[in-house]
Amino acid sequence: MKQELEQLLLAALTRLAGSVLPQMPPADAVVVERTRDAQHGDFASNVALRLAKAARRNPRELASAIVAALPESPLLERAEVAGAGFINFRLAPQAYARELAAIHTRAAAYGESSLGGGERVLVEFVSANPTGPLHVGHGRQAAYGATLANILTAAGFTVAREYYINDAGRQMDILAVSAWVRYLELAGETLPFPENGYRGDYVRSLAEELRTAFGAALRRPAAAVLAGLPADAPAGDKESYIDALIARARELIGTQGFGAVLELSLARMLGDVREDLAEFGVRFDVWTSEREFTESGAIDHALAVLERAGHLYREAGALWFRATAFGDEKDRVVVRENGQKTYFASDIAYHLAKRERGFARLIDVLGADHHGYVARVRAGLIAMGQPGECLEAPLIQFVSLYRGTEKVPMGKREAQYVTLRQLRGEVGNDACRFFYLMRSHDQPLDFDLELAKARTNENPVYYIQYAHARVASVMKQLAARGLSFDCAMGLAAAAKLESSHEQAMLHALTRYPEVIEQAAVNRAPHALVHYLRELANVFHTYYNAEQFIVDDPQLRNARLALVLGVQQVVRNGLTLLGVSAPESM
């Protein structure tokens, strides 16, 4: 309905262009919003206020001209000028009946639109180092990225979902040496575990697999491992110690042996990540290996693009990118003095490759600690001839778990932390997906474990699912009385839905397409969460106030058409969130 009103306004402005208006304004000048007060109609627009200056007219005078130029429409009961120049629209009763019919006709497709025009969007999310199980922070990124991709798809964008596997570099070496030290312990060697190593029980499981796969072939005496190593923390530096330990491991078991430890560790951890996400209902279209990407020549290609454009220079033996010329706070090294390419070089090459794969918009879902990342990568994209605005990076704030009033400790390298799998096991996938999205992604989230498990109306996901199940129960009661639902009769009799509860239900129900577009444009899945809570509240109020299975067949079928419409919209919304819509609870 909102889009149709905007089209009516555009038609009116087209009629006025060249006379009342000097020229046709851009389409984005026309904005229609729902009113907060029903006394002001159903929708309102400030288009006259926005265009008055360019038209050199009083806003109220211009608003009157626009209203007079509006085409006839069965959608509208009337349009009128209000206040300083607002245009208020009151919809005809049949407008809501027609929208209710659209819910029944379009069913699972209701709420979908062509807003995105098929624009290709790549959403990269989670992309956690495969150095341990996913933790609850990764879970929030997964829920946000998956839901955003679903919403963008519903809004008419062509979306691909990608996971970038950080399978190269120092963190993988630390995982491998952590597993090897635990393997040596299993073999009977006594040696301290590195302060900077990964400490979870999963590392002991990796050690068991190493023993099964290699027997004693990788065993080396603890004395040989520790000889000449610098002091570890707290007396020494944990970073220097772990690097020296990695070098010693390569020396003692050889590059091939260390590579075998790394490959087994990577395969197991990446397999665990894939399985965890699949169980969470999160899917990816593409899994890109950092190691394979680095070996593909893509970084050299990106550096060549920068070189040809004159944006690289040499200083102190290193190759630098002139990032400050493109809005970054300082220039960036792309190739170190030793010839090693930097992570930054890999990052900008990866984003150039995304663009060259045909994606118009790149959305990187990142952790809150990546706040300085976007400006750097955007500078690189601009320097390589790409539009800087093609890159977006929603930063996902941290998650804190609470059990009662006690905050649950978390941290990947500590012995105690909460994995996504553990959280899902305790509260279930539905509560996980929903609770992660209850607040805007840019706000910290306190996850209430006890509330998430509660089977009461205080639990918002339960409350929404209960609305869906209640409608299913109504239909079972209908069948038990030997009655059936006549959809055509119900829609034809929609004018009988005239109680205050029914009008509130119709108004809430028909907002759904607008909410999906709003959530897509603002990259805000939480807007859908809030809407579903409001819709469920209106429904439960209606359910408690009215009888649906009444003697009058027209009224009965009209009410059933309404509540089945609610069920459909709730199901559509929950599906986008990755939450189930049960028939009974």
Residue ranges and their predicted role:
Residues 1-97, 108-585:
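Non-catalytic interaction-recognition regions
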Residues 98-103:
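Short, charged, solvent-exposed linker or helix-capping segments at domain edges/interfaces
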